[in-house]
């Protein structure tokens, strides 16, 4: 009986490991060659507040937002300014305002908050992020930091691991990061399908990082 249980547990563990290796972009060099095409693509964008929002808005201006059937903009709780700027951006493009959705999630860690206490706030942020990603099921998530975007990307990866969504994650490192990645970037590097940096030395230093010039 015990032997049977051990064999079954080992088999399940192996299957879970194989699933992880299949889903984890860092372990699958050909993973992003599979690009599912959707007739009604849905885009989710994390607005990171402050300078992060400024850089993201400049990148979004280069996209054909009208080609996305649904655009979900996510901000941290209390970040009203970022969402107002999104409304301005959407109003200047040829998009249907009805296909735009504004959401927010609790901050993973507030400014000046101690790391021990941030465990609870991060858990709450992650739980809300899971619910949000599962609700909208975006085909692509684009983010550029800070900490709260980690929760959003982790949520997407978990749901993808469970085969509940088929979402691709694109992370764009800040222009301010010249010689080394941000903490958010380091954490998310193995989990992103595309990881874009804006300085060539970063692409040389970090495997999987891509340099395609200044993006903002």
From Swiss-Prot:
The chain crosses the membrane at residues 5-25. Residues 26-216 are cytoplasmic. The keyword Membrane applies. One of its GO terms (biological process) is dolichol-linked oligosaccharide biosynthetic process. Coiled coil: none annotated. Belongs to the ALG14 family. Involved in protein N-glycosylation. Essential for the second step of the dolichol-linked oligosaccharide pathway. This is UDP-N-acetylglucosamine transferase subunit ALG14. It comes from Yarrowia lipolytica (strain CLIB 122 / E 150). The gene is ALG14.
